[in-house]
């Protein structure tokens, strides 16, 4: 049997676990010493809290800040709790403003106060600017570290100015052009700067189309869509007065896309994407029990409707055997539509303008699948129980449930979005209740009428 080739991360984790299990803490600290902060963060998320407490003090203070911005919130809270106020300040004071803005809300007040005292006035103002916007908006996502020039200078002057700076912000692919009041006018691409003549004026080379600004209040989901559509590396951010307030870079957008993907998966079962995989048992139990309670309520709703047909079930035991088939088929069909529509809304591909067309299409798909699978299930039922009426009843119930499931799966995300409720979080449990109830009522109701 061929051996499975391990990834670099799996090898690093395996070696780290061996050292920790052998209580060889010095070796464990040495193994992660030369790793990138992102790799260290991933390893810390993959080990138990007690092992993190051993490893964390061995990581250089200058690296700890970079690691803190990469780990999820649960792990971040634990690591912050392991640090003194002085160490927290030293670890975070050199971070980019946007990264610092993400961490500050999770720091103790004493650490925040000390940190603000270490920042110069300009840095402090930039941090306050970002914190004034919602965390999930373009303003909360942006970095205030960018380069601006005036439109009435030459390329030669711009290049001279950049040389005086000696260092450019990370992911700088364009320089922003502003007037004296800091109103955004456009951008000057670095490629243009390097290829045009030195006496060319900036205003004649300003690019207004490729770098349309993003409003600071724009939701981060829409920001991610704009970056995808325009193939952006960075984008300017403006306020309601068209004044340049920051820029968003591709690394921030990658984080948004990753977080949204994790949220979509985790929220479907009531979990938080920032939950620590190795969180204490009672903490994890407390978080999950709420969702289990909600599921229990919906289960009893379905049981109530089944109870209405108790006499019918007593007359024919085969109904009880086949009930899960009807509910399961509707649940799967509805979930398929729910995910398609929820994802479409998140990416901006589904709106009120085209939802009617999509609902019609999903109902048609479920109708076709309903016909195909009702025939298959009807034949299996007839072969199993030799009962023609029972076969017809389950076939009709399957078609009914699949049609209702498709309509519900398409309509629910829209309705929940209108109510400001995350469809990825609440849609699944509501849909399951609908398909279970409709499936059971259709199947048992038809059975009561015809059998």
Residue ranges and their predicted role:
Residues 63, 87, 99, 111, ...:
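A short hydrophobic/aromatic micro-motif that marks alpha-helical segments and, especially, helix-coil
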Residues 157-160, 172, 433, 438-443:
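Extended alpha-helical regions
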Residues 152, 256, 262-407, 411-425, ...:
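Alpha-helical transmembrane segments and their membrane-interface boundaries
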Residues 1-268:
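Hydrophobic packing positions in regular secondary-structure scaffolds
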